[in-house]
Structures are given as C-alpha cells and as structure tokens.
Amino acid sequence: MAHITINQYLQQVYEAIDTRDGASCAELVSFKHPHVANPRLQMASPEEKCQQVLEPPYDEMFAAHLRCTYAVGNHDFIEAYKCQTVIVQSFLRAFQAHKEENWALPVMYAVALDLRIFANNADQQLVKKGKSKVGDMLEKAAELLMSCFRVCASDTRAGIEDSKKWGMLFLVNQLFKIYFKINKLHLCKPLIRAIDSSNLKDDYSTAQRITYKYYVGRKAMFDSDFKQAEEYLSFAFEHCHRSSQKNKRMILIYLLPVKMLLGHMPTIELLRKYHLMQFSEVTKAVSEGNLLLLNEALAKHETFFIRCGIFLILEKLKIITYRNLFKKVYLLLKTHQLSLDAFLVALKFMHVEDVDIDEVQCILANLIYMGHIKGYISHQHQKLVVSKQNPFPPLSTVC
C-alpha cells in the first residue's frame, strides 16, 4: 500500500464503494492508514484522475483526500483542514443519498476523526501566525460534525440494523472533545438529551460508551452534580480495559476529587499504581481535618491541578476539611453544646490567618446550611448546639 500507483489506489476505492465495503473504504480515506505516506499519492491536482474512475460526489471526496495528503506532506495543516472540510461535505452528500443503508458509517468515523484532528492542528498554526484566535477552526469543525449528527439522528426510515443512528454516539464523543477543548460545555446539553433518550444508548460499543460517560461525568462534576459525576466516571473507570493504564489514570484525575467530596478517600496503593501521588497529601489533609496541610498540598501541586482543570473543585474540599476538623472538636469535648471559642482555637492551631469569632460563626453557618452539621448556633450563649443523633452526617448523604 505504501508504494501503489494512483490508478491502483483509485481502483481499490472504486471496488470498496461498489461492493459497499465500509471498512475498506474507511481505510482508504483515513490518515491512520499507511497509504497517506506514499509520495505517489500526494498530489496537488488529482481531480482529473479521480473523475476518470469515480462517480460524483466520490470523485470530489477522494481528490480532496489526495490534496490533503499533499498538504500534510508539506506540514500545511491549514490547507489540510480545508481539504478535510471538502471531504466531509462530499461524504455527507453521498451518505444522505444512501437511503435505508448504513454501510458507510466506518467512512464517516474516519473522516470525522481526521476533521477534528486537522482543525486542532490548523488552529495551532493560525494562532502562531497571529491570524485567528484559539478554537476558531475547531468551532467550524463542530458545525460540520453537527451536520453529520443531524443526518444520523433523523434516520427514522431504516430498520434498526441498517440505521444511521448507530453513528450518533461516535459523533457526540467527537463533539464533546471539541466543546471541552474550546470551553463551551453548555453545547453538550442537547447532545446528552439526544443520547439519553435514544433506544440504542445501551447497545453502542463499550469503547464509545466509556468515552461518553467520561465526558458526561466530567460535565456533571463542573455542574456540582457529584453523585451523577461519580456514577458516570466510575462506569468509565470500571469498564476501561485494564491494559489502558493511561486512560484509567485520566479518568481517575476527575473521579478522585468527586469521590473525596463524597467522603471516599483513595488508598495510597491506588495513587501509587496510577502515578497520582499529587493527591496523597490532599487526601491526608482532608481526612485529618488539617487545613494547614491542605493549603500546602494545593499550593505545591497547583500547576498540575490547574492543568487538569480540577483546582477549583479541589478548593471545595476546604469545607469538608472544616467539617472534619470541627467533628474532631466535637469528639474531643464529648458534648452537644460546643463553645465557639473551641472552634476558634482549632482554626488558630491550623494557622488560619486573621480568624475571629465572626468567621467561626460564618463557617459553621455554611456547614449547617450545606447539611454537613445538624444543629444551630446559639448567639446568646456563643455556642454551637448539635443534634444528639448523627450531628455530622456521612458526606455521601449530603452532597
């Protein structure tokens, strides 16, 4: 394949289309396949050759693919992205013309994936040249992928086996990757609705479902819906193949903060196994109610946490750490009427700066409001009066 002529290549394309061989056709238009490195196929003007062998719109689609290999050979990703746009547009025309059949779904997967990758590369080249802002090309790519999604979602005529609806989840996952990259998470909402209401949602491939749950779980985390985030991210982690260490680690980066907010602390063995020791001091600090250690741990690994987009989520652990510290005060004093001064002493011991009795009341009021403490503040007696039953409810029942 790395040395075939243009005529041999086009003959293979013709046969794949003629026999409705989606998998072979997908390889012949994919940048994951070795033919793209063949100098004989990297052509600046392949239109005439393609028109001699292929019917429209496939002639236009594969001519654009050969121009794309030429552009990539010259490291011109802006041109490669333009060519890939033509490929997807031509494919869409052919795809819509395939009534009640879905043999071309693998082709759609290949061209959609390459579109996203080239959009990303083109973005980087344009930003370096100062010609556009980050995400412009990705945003345009998303619009084109949405056109593909609409074609798949509106296929109501075909039987379930031949339905284009099988392509919906792959496209949703590609769109999620773009929306997370350009920070437009609100655009995920209608896509989540479409998948959750689909009667195929449990029948897609495990790999696609893992990717979907991973992104929806991350979105739930940002929306502070920690129970749903835990459910979706746990599904992704548990179903991810054990050999995919890198992917499991990536899921854990988001699952760990969610679990911690729900009161489940990771073991040191788990953190070691997945090279996530950045969380070890955070875990220790929250468990012990040690605000001093928590602030130090967040500061020490701030760059890593910010890069992963979880720093602000981890900041929410401060309220849990207050709760654990104040629970220690309660266990130490063994009374249901706790002097506010006792909490003030505990906070000063943790080097909380400029803390006074008003701040103690403010923190306690927050903890009571959020359901972390069952009780009330008696301002007259300067005491916290806690419930005799379960004054510090388990975190998993509160969040």
UniProtKB/Swiss-Prot annotation:
UniProt-listed SMART domains: PAM
Residue ranges occupied by any PCI domain in the UniProt entry: 210-391
Tissue: Highly expressed in bone marrow and haematopoietic progenitor cells but is almost undetectable in mature blood cells.
GO BP annotation list: negative regulation of gene expression, epigenetic; negative regulation of lymphoid progenitor cell differentiation; poly(A)+ mRNA export from nucleus; positive regulation of B cell differentiation; protein transport; spleen development
Key words of the record: Acetylation, Cytoplasm, mRNA transport, Nuclear pore complex, Nucleus, Phosphoprotein, Protein transport, Translocation, Transport
Top-level taxonomic group: Eukaryota
GO molecular function: double-stranded DNA binding; RNA binding
Subcellular location, record wording: Cytoplasm; Nucleus, Nuclear pore complex
UniProt note: phenotype after gene disruption: Conditional knockout in bone marrow increases lymphoid cell numbers but decreases the number of myeloid cells. Decreased bone marrow cellularity, enlargement of thymus and cervical lymph nodes with an increased number of lymphocytes, increased lymphocyte numbers in peripheral blood, decreased numbers of granulocytes and monocytes, enrichment of transcription factor Spi1/PU.1 at the promoters of lymphoid fate regulator genes, increased expression of lymphoid fate regulator genes, and enhanced lymphoid differentiation of hematopoietic multipotent progenitor cells.
Keyword Transport assigned: yes
Residues modified as Phosphoserine: 45
GO cellular component, one term: nucleus
Positions of post-translational N-acetylalanine modification: 2
InterPro entries for this protein: Csn12-like, PCI_dom, WH-like_DNA-bd_sf
Alphabetized PANTHER family for the sequence: PCI DOMAIN-CONTAINING PROTEIN 2, UNCHARACTERIZED PROTEASOME COMPONENT REGION PCI-CONTAINING
Task performed by this protein: Required for B-cell survival through the regulation of the expression of cell-cycle checkpoint MAD2L1 protein during B cell differentiation. As a component of the TREX-2 complex, involved in the export of mRNAs to the cytoplasm through the nuclear pores. Binds and stabilizes BRCA2 and is thus involved in the control of R-loop-associated DNA damage and transcription-associated genomic instability. Blocks the activity of the SRCAP chromatin remodeling complex by interacting with SRCAP complex member ZNHIT1 and inhibiting its interaction with the complex.
Subunit field text: Component of the nuclear pore complex (NPC)-associated TREX-2 complex (transcription and export complex 2), composed of at least GANP, 2 copies of ENY2, PCID2, SEM1/DSS1, and either centrin CETN2 or centrin CETN3. The TREX-2 complex also associates with ALYREF/ALY and with the nucleoporin NUP153. Interacts with BRCA2. Interacts with SRCAP chromatin remodeling complex component ZNHIT1; the interaction results in inhibition of SRCAP complex activity, preventing the deposition of histone variant H2AZ1/H2A.Z to lymphoid fate regulator genes and restricting lymphoid lineage commitment.
Similarity field: Belongs to the CSN12 family.
Protein name per its UniProtKB record: PCI domain-containing protein 2
Organism: Mus musculus (Mouse)
Gene from which the chain derives: Pcid2
